[in-house]
Amino acid sequence: MRWLPCLAAVVVLGQALGSDEKLSETPALTNPNPRINVIRDDASAIRWKIDKQRVDGMVEAGLLQVTGSENPTAGWLSLVSPEDTVGIKVNAGPGQISGTRREVADTVVRGLLKAGIPSKQIIIWDAKLEDLHKAKFDTLAKRHGVRLAGSMEAGWDESVVMDKAILGTLIEGDVGFDPDEEKDSRKSHFSRLITGEITRIISIQ
């Protein structure tokens, strides 16, 4: 069996939101012409074992395709700057194998550090810190001196709200959740990580 890491456009970047904003669900928030680059290497993982060198090559190839840059450092600096706080969004909940692979996140972190992004301004984040620890992202963070953060632990910014068209039931961790009473809401609040700290987001799924 082979596990194949494929990177769709390598990374998905977006500028984080400022505070005191209210968002509505509107086509203006989406890119009508998204660009997707898929990088494939069948030998990048065999029997769940990751070939780090091949993963490095995949990320580099995708980065250069997306940015049109001559080298990886120039590619990263065309997307972020040393003044940014870069949030690397991972999917830690499914665990070490089914979720975001640490080897891919490691390649991205090393690329950002080489491009001059200070380690204290790189945050690996997901919904819960507990999930990040279970998936061993804490070892990656310690190795490079970058930070770990969870949206739930950071809290939600009640001044930045997106109104959704579909009514949803509040769950544990949501603003307004009450374990003794079922509540519905169309409002979605953004993490304080996004509204108050992170200025660029790299999503690795």
For every predicted segment, state its role.
Residues W3-L7, G14-Q205:
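N-terminal and secondary-structure boundary signal
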